[in-house]
């Protein structure tokens, strides 16, 4: 019996796995992708939520949408976050977010999508960090 108790106590002392690493924000990379009209570029953006938009249905399900202002590169980017894969992020206008995902060019500044884990393992996972919590 005491061996079982020792095993249970030892098992409880095993540290929890570390959360997935968070990439360093690089708004200059977002700006460079915009200037090159690039698509399918993995980037990490950091800025304040500028505007909340209505959810939009797409072929892969409903998407939460909001615009992030990247102050150091004087541009905005649209974030499209798939709600059928990841939880809604309760962002508030003016609050800071870090967003990692795939950049797709458009004339308004581009958009970031794939801001969630990849359930089938065919794409790099993305995430949104807001108020100290990671949403992926």
Question: How would you describe each model-predicted region?
Answer:
Residues 10-136:
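OB-fold and OB-like single-stranded nucleic-acid-recognition modules
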């Amino acid at each position: 019996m005491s061996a079982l108790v020792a095993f249970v106590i030892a098992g409880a002392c095993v540290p929890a796995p570390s959360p997935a690493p968070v990439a360093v924000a690089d708004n200059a990379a977002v700006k460079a992708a915009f200037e090159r009209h690039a698509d399918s570029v993995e980037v990490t953006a950091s800025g304040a939520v500028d505007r909340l938009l209505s959810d939009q249905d797409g072929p892969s399900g409903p998407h939460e949408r909001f615009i992030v202002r990247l102050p150091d590169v004087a541009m905005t980017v649209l974030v499209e976050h798939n709600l059928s894969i990841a939880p809604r992020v309760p962002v508030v206008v003016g609050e800071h977010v870090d967003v990692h995902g795939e950049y797709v060019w458009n004339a308004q500044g581009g958009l970031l999508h794939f801001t969630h884990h990849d359930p089938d393992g065919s794409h790099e996972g993305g995430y949104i960090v807001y108020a100290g919590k990671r949403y992926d």
